[in-house]
Amino acid sequence: MAREKFQRKKPHVNIGTIGHVDHGKTTLTAAITMALAARGGAKGRKYDDIDSAPEEKARGITINTAHVEYETENRHYAHVDCPGHADYVKNMITGAAQMDGGILVVSGADGPMPQTKEHLLLAKQVGVPNIVVFLNKEDQVDDAELLELLELEIRETLDKYEFPGDEIPIISGSALLALEALTENPETKPGDNKWVDKIYNLMDQVDSYIPTPERETEKPFLMAVEDVFSITGRGTVATGRVERGCVKIGDTVELVGLRDTKTTTVTGLEMFQKTLDESVAGDNVGILLRGVQKIDIERGMVLAKPGSILPHTKFEAQVYVLNKEEGGRHTPFFPGYRPQFYVRTTDVTGKIESFRADDNTATQMVMPGDRIKMIVELIQPIAIEKGMRFAIREGGRTVGAGVVSTIVI
């Protein structure tokens, strides 16, 4: 019998649970899978399955993440949950598991705590666009007024980190009581148990409040140049993987980065020795360009839709500095440090001008294992945009991972 084909009937959204340690992120993840499994939209996963998350490597950094998938009536979700706080920080900065939205879990017994705030700040800086809040452990709060006060405090915290605190849905419940009810009776249907219903309610809010992301193919075309060669009598070919968008023969594209921006026309597209009319995100392709010499292009430039991305030299970034167990530095570094910044396909030297802590106070020293905000100035302009990921390298080894939070120049 032929294998069943993956049917893409529903739009796909990547989400994750974020929040302070022990507020119930993993319990909630398990409860969601069990609740949706009762409706036939998931394979139920136990807490221990999710908690013993396997190690993965992203940009040379080891991260523990658990991936679960489930479906609601409207969507297919991939959901990421990280067991440890350090894993969250690394995951958000490296973009190992991209998130289109997040479920912020806050314990009703504690309210917003330091990591709640840190995850919100990170979500804002790395571009997690939308958040829904689950106010957990509602059964431990005896007073309805206290719940209202907690909700106010959460909304104020959201506002502080530039999320729309007034609009964001806050659903209260108990992930543990829902999970216990579902473990006892995996067939629990909507209406059978008030705690399980709260999980369904949460997922309805996630369905309606977190917008379906724009697909990669609908974004403006961009391809980082990996290699260049010339074909006698035909012109110059740039090869690489299309990062987003699509490109057709006859399109005008810009060569951005390292030198002055140059405009050219696509005269041919090739993939696996076959010619194409159009190439889309994910394709490894050779693009034949009109009127461009081989010496005009080098690895590290990008080909992009005109006006969609600009060359920059100075930016602010959120960076995680690897500790020595992760293969990073053994010693601290200071403002003025000049490592290599590996962006897309190339290394560019840059100078780290200054470091700032979360509260914007200047810091003079950064230790391995720290997360820090830094201002970087590159020696050559390259195509940079907010939300872009990069690695920091020194002598060929990765010493940090970062994401651009603001463009300065």
Curated annotation (Swiss-Prot):
Question: Could you tell me which residues belong to the region G2?
Answer: 60-64
Per UniProt, residues of the tr-type G domain are 10-214
Region described as G1: spans on this chain: 19-26
GO BP annotations of the record are: mitochondrial translational elongation
Q: Where does GTP bind?
A: 19-26, 81-85, 136-139
Q: What class of enzyme is it?
A: hydrolase
The entry's function note states: GTP hydrolase that promotes the GTP-dependent binding of aminoacyl-tRNA to the A-site of ribosomes during protein biosynthesis.
Protein name (database record): Elongation factor Tu, chloroplastic
